[in-house]
Amino acid sequence: MKRYILIGIYSLIISFWGITHAQVLYRISGNSAVAPSYILATNRMMDMSFIDTIPNAFKCYAACNKVITEFAIQDYEAIGALRQAALLPDSVQLRNFYTNEQYLEIDQALRINLNMGLDKLGRMKPSYLAEMYRNELMKRWLNYDEDRSMETFFEKVALQSNIPVYGLDDVGETMYMIFDREPFHWQCEELLKVVEYPEKEVRFERSIREMYQYGRLTDMAYFVKAPDNQTSLSYSDYQVFAKRNKEWVKRLTPHLREGKAFITLNAIYLGGEDGLLAQLKAEGFRIKAVNK
């Protein structure tokens, strides 16, 4: 009996160590860089308090003089453009892409979760509606709090400290990634799928969050592109991310050669053979986990 208790305690220790020392922070050097830079893999479902468990995260941030992220949130004109881009053209009617039963099903789901139906939201693109609906699911089932998400923590700190923040994507690219990276009929199917099978979306995000807590970035990439992943974030999205990573390497290279860049990006973009870390390594940069 004593032996089993000791084994149980040991397993708990290993589990705790794995979570609190997840490999999500990396040092980037070499390839003519005059000083190291750092890249932090983030997960929007994680509370900002998780950063306290990442060894040397604040020390590495303090050693940098700029923050680089996917899209700079301080660009208010860009945010206005994004809101406009979320609207359907006047010539497109969402009702025409669904049966009456499907349209009513979506309308009812939106009313229950967003307190608004398609009478008010029917001019929005289906990709935007699907994301709004998913966010409400995550708030309800995974305690997602956008204001406390670790995803934008360092960006906000930098802005408060007058440290420059650079976005890897411009406004047009960001609008494409959010609203138009998939054909319109796919977006319509995706919205219906999210409404009909919300539990799949929640299970997916829960699994991704758990992998992130253990620093399993490669597993996260494989999980997204797996053939049996039928959620709103799947293989077609992974292909878009992989292609974009190649462009990001070009845009990051000047910053990395200058050094002292603190990069924060969604962990899904980083792992796997097509992930940003592998592509930076292929470009000649040295990548090393900070907490090893």
Each language-model region and where it sits:
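Structured, acidic catalytic/metal-binding patches in enzyme active sites
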Residues: 24, 30-232, 236
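A cross-kingdom marker for long, charged
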Residues: 234-292
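Bacterial Sec-dependent N-terminal signal peptides
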Residues: 1-27
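Active-site-proximal flexible loops/turns
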Residues: 9, 49, 273
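Short, solvent-exposed secondary-structure boundary motifs
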Residues: 18-19, 47-50, 240-245
